[in-house]
């Protein structure tokens, strides 16, 4: 099935839904299944759809320590872009759809949290939007209907691509890996199984990942986002928002529960009448009590810092002092944080690839415990054999300091 045939089927799906009173993204399960099957076998279909898949996926995933929440954020962003194109195609006379606020609503909470500003502007330019000022995008001239359908179909395909990549990570058993390796494996494979096998071989070699730039975490769950209105308008109005549903009430499930459905579930369920908008799962944040007890980021290990640590333990290295009177008694020492430990996934002498500052454990890149460890934890990649050896030595020294009995005077 060629791109022109897919575009026609997609157009018929949108118009069929409009006759049913719903102007939203495509929710046809048969079209979704067909497009999924073609995309899995041929990544190059994205080129025929002209959806800039490689540039958008690379931009959205690059620098992310955990690719699973990044994919959820990207899927949400592509869904919002698809909806913007669908609105212009089905309802071109609606003036509210011709202006997009770039300082509030879904643009800030969903789009800018997943993609760079330059690529967002390029995506909206395909729909006929131009930057009017620093705060608004406006439709200068409405593109042909065929072009709007093509843009919306491309965003639909990008949503399915996020689903395919999510399935790869689910079968792989970990989502902590470099984005470029995931995309390279996806482009070189013809199905999910071969992509997973390729990545398993790469992880088994434990090759050193390339350095990744720092990047903030994806935007978490937000209630009732709108591309076209201000925050004040969103909060003060109970009218149907861009997504066709009222804002969640006090009896609605929490954002955490609302995020439980898997992000690749069908659009009909995500966008059905009366249902709240689906949002990506938010990286869990510590409560106020936990944040007060949060430990500072540990410094990079060196033997100088080890010496300072040893010298700070007078009970082990210094002779005992004469007992003091109660008036002269010093305050009790502040308990030290526990040392770093080697997780059981690491064989004796094996170099760690990841460090969890919350659990204070070192892991291998393919550790099976990572999916249950990393949500909400401070997980970082150890780059370079020299850094990995230093952390291995630190864990060995910590084992001596904290596990063995204190030395006598």
UniProtKB/Swiss-Prot annotation:
UniProt gene name: SPATA2L
Family, per entry: Belongs to the SPATA2 family.
Gene3D superfamilies linked: 1.20.58.2190
Name recorded for this polypeptide: Spermatogenesis-associated protein 2-like protein
Cross-referenced Pfam families: SPATA2_PUB-like
Stretches the record annotates as Disordered: 233-257, 270-299, 313-337
Record organism: Bos taurus (Bovine)
Alphabetical list of PANTHER family matching this protein: SPERMATOGENESIS-ASSOCIATED PROTEIN 2-LIKE PROTEIN, SPERMATOGENESIS-ASSOCIATED PROTEIN 2/TAMOZHENNIC
Disulfide bonds: none
InterPro entries referenced in this protein's UniProt entry, alphabetically: SPATA2_PUB-like
A GO cellular component entry from the record: cytoplasm
Superkingdom: Eukaryota
